Structure formats: C-alpha cells, structure tokens
Regions:
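Active-site-adjacent helix/loop patches that line small-molecule binding or acyl-intermediate pockets
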Residues: 1-65, 104, 108-111
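A penicillin-recognizing enzyme superfamily signal
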Residues: 3-6, 52-58, 62-249
C-alpha cells in the first residue's frame, strides 16, 4: 500500500473500497467533514465526488492532528496595541480516528517523495523533493480538469488546487505541475517566515517498525531496496507473526 500511495496506483484503492464495502468510505468521508449526497459507488474511491479546497484541507487537518478534528477559525486572537488579549478563540476538538491508525497513514504518505520507490513509474512527489527541507505526508491527485496537491506535518496543512476557472481540460503537461510547486513553496515559506523548527510525530507504543520491501511488503531479497514500514503490534502480517512464533519456539 505504501507503493500504491506513492505512485497513485488506483487499483489498490478500488480493491480496498470494494473489499470493505462502498458504505464504509461514505461514512468515513462524513466523519472527516465531507458532507452532501455522497454516492456509495465503486468510482468513489477514485475521487469522483466533488469537494472544495476547504473541505479537503479540513479533512487532512484531522490526519495532521493525529486523528483529532479542530474547528477552523480565521481569527485566533485579538489584542490591544499593548498586546493585551481581549479575545482568544477556543477551538472545539473532536476525536475522529485512532491515533495509531492515523500514524500508520501519516508515515505511509511520506513515500510520495521517495525516489527509491521508482519502479515502473515514479512517485508523484519526486519532482518537488529537492525543494523540501523537512518531512511531510502528502497526496496528489488529478482529473482532466483538476490537479490537487495536499500535504501536511504536525506544524502545517496546505491544499492547492490548480485548473481553469471555465473547467477546460488541462492538456499541457507543464500546467499539471503548478499545484505541486505552489504547495512546496507555501509549506517551506511557513518555516522561513515564522522561524518554526520542523517537528514530526512520535511513534505510538502499540506501533512497530519493520524493515521490508515496499514493493512486495515481504522481507527483501538480496540487494533489494528496503524501507521502514509501520504496523500495529496487534495486527502484524501473517508472515511476521509466524516468524516471531517460530523464533519463540527455538
């Protein structure tokens, strides 16, 4: 799944969607703040339901906040000329998803920038990797008329849509890349302007990292690229659980 996320290989999204059942994705989207008459159809896994930039940003912010939804606000506080606070926003926090499950996704979505995952196709974030100074989770997406780039870490969430305002097809290959470069410039500018030191997520106690082949998900063969993949300790792949059992019996 890490490779599928990195390269936007949609067959895995479709198979997972059909395996879990269409209603599962509809309910998850609504939990993450995307509402409306969402159709429970197979193509929903491909992003066929229209959402706004704000809706998508709010949904990804839940991942950035480790499973907690925080009500967005334009004004966080108001002060006097003497820096006396006369108003401070008190955002509402709601737990939406399990922290450990979100951590697995956050780690997996960093792979969009991993050039070592280039096999048949290149991960979609590789063209902007050299512009980034720290770790981000991200996902790109596209249709004939839209190009998306959404990414985050514990400090910031940014979503960028690019396309024509008259819904014309985006036909020039150069035009499909603008969103990614705008996104990279935006997230990096945040650190330059604020002087904030980048942070990343602490691995939960019930999560384990294992060095495996990101292409097969199994232990790598000789000379094969390996990557740290993350699992819930209670939900390890069968071959790892079997190996642990064999080792404990020797």
């Amino acid at each position: 799944m890490v490779y599928a996320l990195a390269t936007s290989d949609n067959i895995y999204a479709m198979k997972t969607h059909l395996f879990l059942g269409p209603d599962k994705l509809v309910n998850t989207l609504k939990r993450f703040g995307i509402h409306g008459n969402i159709p429970a159809i197979p193509s929903l896994a491909l992003g066929t339901y229209e959402v706004s930039v704000l809706e998508l940003t709010k949904a990804y912010a839940i991942l950035a906040n480790e499973g907690v939804a925080i009500s967005p606000s334009i004004i966080t506080k108001i002060t006097t000329m003497d820096d006396e606070i006369i108003y401070k926003e008190k955002p509402k926090e709601t737990k939406i998803a399990n922290q450990s499950d979100v951590y697995l996704l956050n780690e997996a979505m960093t792979s969009i920038f991993d050039n070592n995952l280039t096999y048949n196709i290149r991960p979609t974030g590789v063209p902007i990797r050299s512009l980034l100074s720290t770790t981000y989770s991200a996902k790109s997406g596209s249709t004939d008329t839209d190009n998306w780039m959404v990414g985050y870490n514990p400090d910031i969430v940014v979503a960028v849509w690019s396309g024509y305002d008259d819904a014309r097809n985006v036909e020039l290959s150069e035009d499909t890349k603008f969103g990614k470069f705008i996104w990279a410039d935006s997230v990096e500018a945040y650190y330059r302007v604020t002087g904030t030191n980048p942070t990343w997520y602490k691995t939960p106690d019930d999560v384990i990292e294992i060095e495996l082949s990101p292409f097969s998900g199994f232990y790598a063969g000789f000379g094969e690229y390996t990557k740290k993949l993350y699992f819930r300790k209670k939900n390890l792949p069968w071959y790892i659980s079997l190996l642990k059992e064999e080792n404990s019996n020797t």
